[in-house]
Amino acid sequence: MKTKLMITIFSCLLLWSMLLLLSFSNIFKHQLLGATINVGSKDSVKPRDRLLGGLLTADFDEDSCLSRYQSSLYRKPSPYRTSEYLISKLRNYEMLHKRCGPGTDAYKRATEKLGHDHENVGDSSDGECKYIVWVAVYGLGNRILTLASVFLYALLTERIILVDQRKDISDLFCEPFPGTSWLLPLDFPLMGQIDSFNREYSHCYGTMLKNHTINSTTIPSHLYLHLLHDYRDQDKMFFCQKDQSLVDKVPWLVVKSNLYFIPSLWLNPSFQTELIKLFPQKDTVFYHLARYLFHPTNQVWGMVTRSYNAYLSRADEILGIQVRVFSRQTKYFQHVMDQIVACTQREKLLPEFAAQEEAQVTNTSNPSKLKAVLVTSLNPEYSNNLKKMYWEHPTTTGDIVEVYQPSRERFQQTDKKLHDQKALAEMYLLSLTDKLVTSALSTFGYVAQGLGGLKPWILYTPKKFKSPNPPCGRVISMEPCFLTPPVHGCEAKKGINTAKIVPFVRHCEDLRHYGLKLVDDTKNEL
């Protein structure tokens, strides 16, 4: 009897222990899940909008591309609303791409017409698909900006965008359109030729205009658009309204570009009304397009989340500093270091250094905050020196400053898979910061600010190896800069300032007398 009682008591204790353990396990799991979901949201525990206000479709398998639906977990709720018109336009485009994309009968018919220039290809029947092929050139920042530009043009003209997959595009980004692919098939008829396309190519639009070999009755099966920094006046005519009516008839366009040419699309009257409906807030174009198009692959996303959770998630505030020095010498420059410190302290982005005797007073007056500084640069010396400064000196505010640099590559290695993946991860990490400092004229910085919806402080270009005064200034628009736009209007050879045609296209802060960018606040003068 006594033994039976002991067994009963032991069984009850064992059952109670198991229930208690299960309870603790569920609590821990819930807390871990909560920590994952609320990462990056220090001021809010609101549920995240995984579809970004309808910008994204729910028609994807989440595991195949974790970043697509998880990115909102790492961002504060967006203050920039997506227009219903843009959402509708994207859903319609997705259906069009599914009907006309690789592997479809429509794609097969379209490729069969390539090379038949003497046939009247411009008179194709309604419903035939038209295409624009994006060829990867220059660095990753340039590629992302041009890909967004080409996609917007495709959206406006109802063309199918296909991207050159021979570089590392599929190692960087997930497919953006459900049920189809945006990768240009490797057996594309012109694949063996497109690398040699240049300004002198017989089917280059600028060359055909120059030689008078294209008009409304002689429509070629394809055109090459040379929209690189060295393009000629004839190449720039692509942006003009009259020329668009001609280009629109060509079934296949192949484009090489290293420019964010979206501002010039806004200057075209035939596109302007549609663009205003798509983007009522005019300085959010790249922001919305980038969040729709560019979803890092799982490998890249792993780099992002591991870095964020390990080094940034616990901070009260995150500051991003992107350092790009345009010099033949890929080395550390002291004047750039001085400029970084001057900018961040002058603009109150980082605390100033205090004398040792002040530190004791400061540290007891207010609770200290943790500021995480994410530095991206090919050189490690900038982050090393910043870290050393804030380790050796107390701050006037008592704040703790931690400095972190994910990679230290020393020199650019475009088209090397791991290098480009690290670069993309760093762009994305910069976009997750609360405040951002970027280098003038850097497409790397443009991508980060646009993706994050941030208006950064730009480090002005140094002159004669001296830190400029002021060292930096804040931009009025998060849009990237069109660095080498047409310098005059379509209807005049000269005398037209393209930054004064419409109030929402202005000169860039980092290229005041030449570059163009979209702005939304028309009260600011540059």
UniProtKB/Swiss-Prot annotation:
Top-tier EC class? transferase
In alphabetical order, the GO MF annotations are: galactoside 2-alpha-L-fucosyltransferase activity
**Where expressed (tissues)?**
Expressed in roots, leaves, stems and seedlings.
Alphabetically ordered keywords of this record:
Cell wall biogenesis/degradation, Glycoprotein, Glycosyltransferase, Golgi apparatus, Membrane, Signal-anchor, Transferase, Transmembrane, Transmembrane helix
Q: Which InterPro entries match?
A: XG_FTase
Q: Does the keyword Metal-binding apply?
A: no
Which segments does the topology annotation call Lumenal?
A: 26-526
Pfam families in the record: XG_FTase (PF03254)
- The EC number(s) this enzyme carries: 2.4.1.-
- UniProt-listed GO biological process terms: cell wall biogenesis; cell wall organization; protein glycosylation; xyloglucan biosynthetic process
Q: Copy the pathway line from the protein's UniProt record.
A: Protein modification; protein glycosylation
> Among its keywords, does the record have Aminoacyl-tRNA synthetase?
no
Q: What does this protein do?
A: May be involved in cell wall biosynthesis. May act as a fucosyltransferase.
What the record says about family reads: Belongs to the glycosyltransferase 37 family.
**Protein's UniProt name:** Probable fucosyltransferase 7
Question: Can you name the source organism?
Answer: Arabidopsis thaliana
